[in-house]
Amino acid sequence: MAGFRFGFVDALVHTLFPPSLPARASIVSGAVLGADSYWVGDHLNALVPRSVATPKYLGVAAKVVPKIDANYEPWTMLGNLAAGNRLNGLRLGVCVTDAGRRNPAVTAQAAATLHLLTRGKAMLGIGVGEREGNEPYGVEWTKPVARFQEALATIRALWDSNGELVSRESQFFPLHNALFDLPPYRGKWPEIWVAAHGPRMLQATGRYADAWIPIVLVRPTDYSCALEVVRTAASDAGRDPMSITPAAVRGIITGRTRDDVDEALDSVLVRMIALGVPGEAWARHGVEHPMGADFAGVQDIIPQTIDEETVVSYAAKVPAALMKEVLFSGTPEEVIDQVAEWRDHGLKYLVVINGSLVNSSLRKTVSALLPHARVLRGLKKL
């Protein structure tokens, strides 16, 4: 397996700029800094409550992003980006697409198409999705994990069919003389990166995935324990457990000084990230999750229904110690040390969210750019 690598992910939110310009700028800067991949999210609307996506909390950025819930469709955008990406050479992927509202045959087709367009540089990130992108639109949400397991098995069945008719019983996605005849690129399909956290998801990762990319694990010890479950499942399925890339999606907040970092961590929008962490993580810090002790986390939030007063009250309850778990934060040297600890617990690939961009002060947002670049360069040396 290669040494430590990193990519980065952007939300595909509509801005005042031409639709693909922010993404293209990110790809160019990422290539300069040594990134391996560029990812885009897959959401119908934002995970940030629109009630606080305002100048009061976002500053000037709210003028650039006037509607936080206006999100572009990811596969369409990636197809557009692929045309100009050959010189940069970054791999392109969705982080992560939804096994609920997207039929797996359509997902298999989209990923295979992008793989051909990019000459073998497409990646399929996939997970259960979130309630906010399913239930409000009439998509059944009572068994998201079972639906995900069947979606993943369906994608593999279609890709492995060699153009032969496929029939397969399934509670959610039965196939009856189904046909999938797109070819792989030079004999290889896109890598499947699974956002898994619970036991059944981790087992499915070991059975079907090329990489594991959790989003809400908050401690390196949790990471290493879950990675062991993935590798055991891979062995049980007759696969090489070490062939599965251990990755993670994590936000990074850095700045020129520790005071700048602490100020950013204390903002309402950044503290809202902790709402996506399950109640058990809050309980370790002696605080009940404001949405309930048993709240599952990001997959069950419907942010468009949360008003400003409620958001602010929730943010005030977030323990400072929890904020330091849900993000890599600090000076560049401190952040690199934190990533190194995760590396020592098995992490080999980090997909970065630049949390330093979420700041009501334009000056401090700009001043964090160079420290963030120092972090990314430092990751290459891990």
From Swiss-Prot:
Biological process according to GO: lipid metabolic process
Molecular function per GO: oxidoreductase activity, acting on paired donors, with incorporation or reduction of molecular oxygen
Primary enzyme class: oxidoreductase
Highest taxon, organism lineage: Bacteria
SUPFAM superfamilies: Bacterial luciferase-like (SSF51679)
Disulfide bonds: none
EC number: 1.2.-.-
Protein name in UniProt: Phthiodiolone/phenolphthiodiolone dimycocerosates ketoreductase
